Amino acid sequence: MRGSALLDLILFLLVSPLAHSFKGSEISKFYDKSISNQISQSDRESGYVLVSTVDGSISLVDMSSQKLDWTFHTNEPIYSSYQAPHYHYTTDEERSSVLGDDFYMDCDKDWRLYNSSVRKGKRVNEIVDASEFIGTLPYTSTDRIVLGKKDTSVFLLDWKTGKLVKRYRMDELYSNTVVENDKEKAIVLSKEAPLLFGSGFKKSEDFPELVYIERKDFKIQCISKFGDVLWSVSYAKMEAKLQNHESVQFISGLSSSVGKNQFPLSYTTSVPMVQLRNVKYETLFPRLGFLDEALYLPFQDRKPNQLAIGDGNQLTLPGNKEAEEVLSLPLPETVISQITDIIDGSTKQAGFASKFSGLIVLIFGFCVTMLSVCGLFFYRLRQSIRIKEPYVSEVPIATPKKKKSKKNGTTKAVHKKENGFISGGNKDPSHEENEKRLLTAFPGLNNSSAEGYRVGKLFVSNKEIAKGSNGTVVLEGSYEGRLVAVKRLVQSHHDVAQKEILNLMASDKHSNIVRWYGVDQDEHFIYISLELCACSLNDLIYASSALLESPMASSSIHSIQINPIFENGKGVELWKENGHPSPVLLKLMRDIVAGLVHLHDIGIVHRDLKPQNVLIVKNSSLCAKLSDMGISKRLPADTSALTRNSTGLGSGSSGWQAPEQLRNERQTRAVDLFSLGCVLFFCMTGGKHPYGDNYERDVNVLNDQKDLFLIESLPEAVHLLTGLLNPDPNLRPRAQDVMHHPLFWNSDMRLSFLRDASDRVELENREEGSQLLAALESTAAVTLNGRWDEKLDSIFLDNIGRYRRYKFDSIRDLLRVIRNKLNHYRELPKELQELLGSVPEGFERYFSSRFPKLLIQVYTVLFDYCNNEEFFFKYSKTTVF
């Protein structure tokens, strides 16, 4: 450690003088006029000027001393625009329908929004007010949609240093309070903000001067009917205002004299500000580069000590005062010798000698830096080699055994494992050697063996099952003698791990949630021991679909590690010959819904439901289980939606997110229902997606452009998915309702419902104008598609005609026929029984094949009119399939 620290110090001392070797700055003549035209004569003679470049950087220039005082990088550009090229469209019809009259919008050099269109063969630019125009949006037509948005934000900076004190945005606002002298004082700073001042200031001169950078962002986008972005423009207008000392007192502690209707912040002095649309910070100050900020030494963790008191409130104890100090190296004093000339509209060229000397210093600094880094690397490598041989534990554990590989035709070697669980495929010898070196390099892994290493009660194998994002890896392992999947997360993601553990504990012991056994950690990683599963739903569907298309595809199944499910090269039957889901697939789909029902019942929103996060376990039958709840959220008590701060950007996976997730809007349990619709479609179609290919899914989700053509032969699926994929989250069904949807009913349940529906409809009096009966018969055109007698066999019609007469255009009479023949099936002639098939499968298939929409149409009507009646509870409240 001493050698490492010494090398770090040498590296720092060698590099730090480079910061002092750059003096002066040059600004190209090309930008002189655009700056000087925006500055008044009085501002050019004295005072300060703030210069903002297109990348969002803000620099303070002191006119009296001709120095660049500081630069603050917002990392948010103040201007960007895009226009789709005409040649993007392959046909003249597409080009004309999409581009129309070549209308687009942009902002000019004076930061004024204008619309540009062709009128009478000439292009005309018309200045418009951005705020008023956005207020009229959205605009929709047959060939385009124009969307707009206006955001406001404020950056509170220390006037002297340019350091960020606080950023105010609508999606980030929250307050923080402390207690002092039994009085509550408001603190502007958040926990993450630099501690520039706090509640201890008593005099106005103790407060730093603050500058408020007010920013207004305008965003406008035009989208074609094909979902393509035709053009977009985003730009910002910024103003700066300097805060006086008296106003700052209102920030630190509200005075009792301030009335309820008074706004405590009053601006006093405006600071001139210049916005350069086509200039980047590096272009304006080409020789400053990385020297625009001070170099900071590492500081200690200054998180306040907290004690839980009372009903869970936290008492914040005073932290270490020394830890609050942030040490920094002095920022080099950069003299901008030409700043006066810039404002006046003229510049001087730097000499060749100055440029050449600067280049030499850069090359020298780069060489010294690389040599120092290489020296540090080889020193640490040498230290790692000195580590003793790892200790091999003698405790008997279920260590995965190596199996000889076997080949199937042209297939590469495939590893099989006991108990039908997955294992890694072939590994390159060099890769295995690298793994051993990795274990040796980490001091925390000293107690490792050739097969893996032990952490507490957990033995972690070197066999990798899967990889996740942000360094997360899933490995095989053993926890107290039980085979488990070990989810290894880096320590920096401790919050994600803790959240997943808490949610797993809350949802544990449900048959459709992955079991959690324990958690361990070492210096580098957190290890979560989970139930070991055979594969993911994603792998199962793709492999089964490949086998369905070509039986020879079994030779490549090992690539997705699901060999145990496919015995003798044969996969499980997930689809019937007609393409409809098999009972096995329907059970897996029900398992997913059941797991989601359980999570929602205990107040957990998964937020990342997708085929990769549904795992398959093979026991006596296949079972689906929900997993990977690292970004799931617990709903607060007595609430149905997540708070604004807890929704979070980036929740979920691209292509599987609800539109409100993509827009970062209010999120409820309904976000999981939308993802569920996509997952169910994925299952029924053998790996397809209702919103198209990967690159276009999110755009299609936002535009509600789904395609359910592949499941049109299954009306129950169309009905369910149309509800689940509704863009309005309030109109999506609950998970509990999905659980009882007719899509998941077996043949016995379907026939039982049609029989009970007929009994219920018979109670209605046709002559009294029954609303239920009228609603049912109104669906005849869709349900029957003509007369129902035209779709039945003559032998069947002869049999029913012997007893009574029927109306062949009435759904009520068709239900009566089905009910009567089902009740008297044993009394039917043998040839008619053979025609109808056995009860329930054959009998139900006879009618559903001729009237595929009968069940869902009758269900929809009775759900609306009889949902609260006792006979209907069997189909909407109980889980009978």
Swiss-Prot record:
Senses unfolded proteins in the lumen of the endoplasmic reticulum via its N-terminal domain which leads to enzyme auto-activation. The active endoribonuclease domain splices bZIP60 mRNA to generate a new C-terminus, converting it into a potent unfolded-protein response transcriptional activator which then induces transcription of UPR target genes. Involved in organ growth regulation. Plays a role in plant immunity and abiotic stress responses. Required for ER stress-induced autophagy. The chain crosses the membrane at residues 358-378. Induction: By ER stress inducer tunicamycin, by salicylic acid (SA) and by bacterial pathogen infection. The lineage of its organism: Eukaryota, Viridiplantae, Streptophyta, Embryophyta, Tracheophyta. The active site is at residue 608. Residues 22-357 are lumenal. Residues 481-502 are annotated as: ATP selon article. It holds the Pfam family Pkinase. Disruption phenotype: No visible phenotype. Ire1a and ire1b double mutant is more sensitive to the ER stress inducer tunicamycin than the wild-type and is enable to give rise to the spliced bZIP60 mRNA form. Ire1a and ire1b double mutant displays short roots and a ER stress-sensitive phenotype. GO terms for molecular function: ATP binding; metal ion binding; protein serine kinase activity; protein serine/threonine kinase activity; RNA endonuclease activity. The keyword Signal applies. Glycans are attached at residue 115. Residues 459-744 form the Protein kinase domain. It is found in: Endoplasmic reticulum membrane. Its cofactor is Mg(2+). ATP binds at residues 465-473, 487. Ubiquitous. Detected in the apical meristem, at leaf margins where vascular bundles end, in the anthers before pollen is formed and in the ovules at a very early stage of development. There is no expression in more mature embryos. Also strongly expressed in the cotyledons immediately after germination but not later on. One of its GO terms (cellular component) is endoplasmic reticulum. Residues 642-661 are annotated as: Disordered. PROSITE patterns: KEN, PROTEIN_KINASE_DOM, PROTEIN_KINASE_ST. GO terms for biological process: autophagy; defense response to bacterium; endoplasmic reticulum unfolded protein response; immune system process; mRNA processing; positive regulation of autophagy in response to ER overload; response to salicylic acid; RNA splicing. Residues 1-21 form the signal peptide. It is a single-pass type I membrane protein. This is Serine/threonine-protein kinase/endoribonuclease IRE1b. Residues 747-878 form the KEN domain. Its main location: endoplasmic reticulum.
